[in-house]
Structures are given as C-alpha cells and as structure tokens.
Amino acid sequence: AATAATPATAATPARA
C-alpha cells in the first residue's frame, strides 16, 4: 500500500 510512497520501501526490493 505504501509502496513507492516511502524512500525506505523503494530501497528495499523485498518491500517493493
């Protein structure tokens, strides 16, 4: 849901 919304999420391939 918060994908690409947070820089930390975009930095982690597992979350992305």
From Swiss-Prot:
Subcellular location per the Swiss-Prot or TrEMBL entry: Secreted
Post-translational modification: O-glycosylated; contains disaccharide galactose-N-acetylgalactosamine attached to threonines.
Keywords, ordered alphabetically: Antifreeze protein, Glycoprotein, Secreted
Protein name: Ice-structuring glycoprotein 8R
Organism per entry: Eleginus gracilis (Saffron cod)
Superkingdom field: Eukaryota
Entry GO CC: extracellular region
Stated role: Antifreeze proteins lower the blood freezing point.
Primary site of residence: secreted
